[in-house]
């Protein structure tokens, strides 16, 4: 699933491509991907709207239109591509926004897990999925004090806590593993067992890793590309995720993989305590 760095890069490329484009037709080929509103109403609400800009909150994309906002989640493999209307439509294209300039913004999703819904313009706080999100890790709202308070309140594994979007928005499986490694903390450690120094290291690792991942275009581990079709580069920086049995870059011991709350989890048994 694309995490914050990947979604931020999708947002940035979309922001270069679609503002100012006016929707004159919407085609929904997979109705279940439209949530909270019947698909025909979704289409009716969007025709005639102009895209003013693209924002992000956590792993959500928000397309601000003339009178409303489209809230979209890529889920596992969703992608947006801007294409000429004459280009062949692939079988994995499930939603099409056709513009007056004869281009189309197409939403492709091999697994059909992605979702879209229409909300009040700038009213994302009124939607349950957005309202519950915690602070963005690269903003001033993400403070060491609040983070430490949240961590100390739970006995869940620290990796599980990092994946809780109410604690910090946008961290997923890849970056949670990398954060724990950088902080030298075992991912299965109970969050409330961590010392203040360990919590501080996790906080700092979250900021530094997410900053670099955004700068490098995210991680292309499976099929991720941004909206211009470009691969990410941070996968070349990964130290534990996907490195099972490979030598640790610090100590040389083999990286181990376990299941933690149903998620594949990678760590160095020597460096992380």
From Swiss-Prot:
Q: Which UniProt keywords apply?
A: DNA damage, DNA repair, DNA-binding, Glycosidase, Hydrolase, Lyase, Metal-binding, Multifunctional enzyme, Zinc, Zinc-finger
Q: Which GO terms describe its molecular function?
A: 8-oxo-7,8-dihydroguanine DNA N-glycosylase activity; class I DNA-(apurinic or apyrimidinic site) endonuclease activity; damaged DNA binding; zinc ion binding
Q: Report the co-factor binding details.
A: Binds 1 zinc ion per subunit.
The source's superkingdom equals Bacteria
For whether the record's keyword set contains Hydrolase, the answer is yes
Where in the sequence is the active site? Answer: 2 (schiff-base intermediate with dna), 3 (proton donor), 59 (proton donor), 263 (proton donor)
Q: Which cofactor does it need?
A: Zn(2+)
Catalyses:
Hydrolysis of DNA containing ring-opened 7-methylguanine residues, releasing 2,6-diamino-4-hydroxy-5-(N-methyl)formamidopyrimidine; 2'-deoxyribonucleotide-(2'-deoxyribose 5'-phosphate)-2'-deoxyribonucleotide-DNA = a 3'-end 2'-deoxyribonucleotide-(2,3-dehydro-2,3-deoxyribose 5'-phosphate)-DNA + a 5'-end 5'-phospho-2'-deoxyribonucleoside-DNA + H(+)
A Gene Ontology annotation in the biological process aspect, one of them, is: base-excision repair
Is Lyase included in the keywords of this UniProt record? Answer: yes
Q: Which InterPro entries match?
A: DNA_glyclase/AP_lyase_DNA-bd (IPR015886), DNA_glyclase_Znf_dom_DNA_BS (IPR015887), Formamido-pyr_DNA_Glyclase (IPR020629), FPG_cat (IPR012319), MutM-like_N-ter (IPR035937), Ribosomal_uS13-like_H2TH (IPR010979), Znf_DNA_glyclase/AP_lyase (IPR000214), Znf_FPG/IleRS (IPR010663)
User: What Enzyme Commission number does this protein have?
Assistant: 3.2.2.23, 4.2.99.18
- Zn finger (FPG-type) start-end: 239-273
Give the residues the record marks as binding DNA.
92, 111
Q: Which family does it belong to?
A: Belongs to the FPG family.
What is the role of this chain?
Involved in base excision repair of DNA damaged by oxidation or by mutagenic agents. Acts as a DNA glycosylase that recognizes and removes damaged bases. Has a preference for oxidized purines, such as 7,8-dihydro-8-oxoguanine (8-oxoG). Has AP (apurinic/apyrimidinic) lyase activity and introduces nicks in the DNA strand. Cleaves the DNA backbone by beta-delta elimination to generate a single-strand break at the site of the removed base with both 3'- and 5'-phosphates.
Record HAMAP family? Fapy_DNA_glycosyl (MF_00103)
Cite the record's note on assembly: Monomer.
Protein name according to UniProt: Formamidopyrimidine-DNA glycosylase
Q: Which organism is it from?
A: Listeria monocytogenes serotype 4b (strain F2365)
Q: Which gene encodes it?
A: mutM
């Amino acid at each position: 699933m694309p995490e914050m760095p990947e979604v931020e890069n999708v947002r940035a490329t979309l922001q270069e491509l679609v503002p100012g484009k006016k929707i004159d037709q919407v085609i929904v080929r997979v109705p279940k991907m439209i949530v909270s509103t019947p698909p025909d109403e979704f289409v009716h609400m969007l025709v005639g709207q102009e895209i003013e800009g693209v924002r992000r909150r956590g792993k959500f994309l928000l397309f601000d239109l003339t009178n409303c906002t489209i809230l979209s989640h890529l889920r596992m493999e969703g992608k947006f591509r801007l294409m000429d209307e004459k280009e062949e439509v692939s079988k994995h294209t499930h939603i099409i926004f056709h513009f007056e300039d004869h281009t189309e913004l197409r939403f492709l999703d091999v697994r059909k897990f992605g979702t879209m819904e229409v909300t009040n313009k700038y009213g994302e706080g009124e939607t349950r999925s957005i309202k519950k999100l915690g602070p963005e890790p690269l903003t001033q709202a993400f403070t060491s004090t609040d983070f430490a308070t949240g961590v100390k309140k739970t006995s869940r594994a620290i990796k599980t806590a990092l994946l809780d979007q109410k604690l910090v928005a946008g961290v997923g499986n890849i970056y949670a593993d990398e954060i724990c490694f950088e902080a030298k903390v075992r991912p299965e450690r109970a969050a409330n067992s961590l010392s203040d120094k360990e919590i501080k290291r996790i906080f700092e690792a979250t900021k530094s890793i997410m900053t670099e991942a955004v700068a490098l275009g995210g991680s292309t581990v499976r099929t991720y590309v941004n909206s211009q079709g470009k691969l990410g580069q941070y996968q070349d920086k990964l130290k534990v995720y996907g490195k099972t049995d490979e030598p640790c870059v610090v100590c040389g011991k083999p990286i181990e993989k376990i299941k933690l709350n149903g998620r594949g989890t990678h760590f160095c048994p020597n460096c992380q305590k």
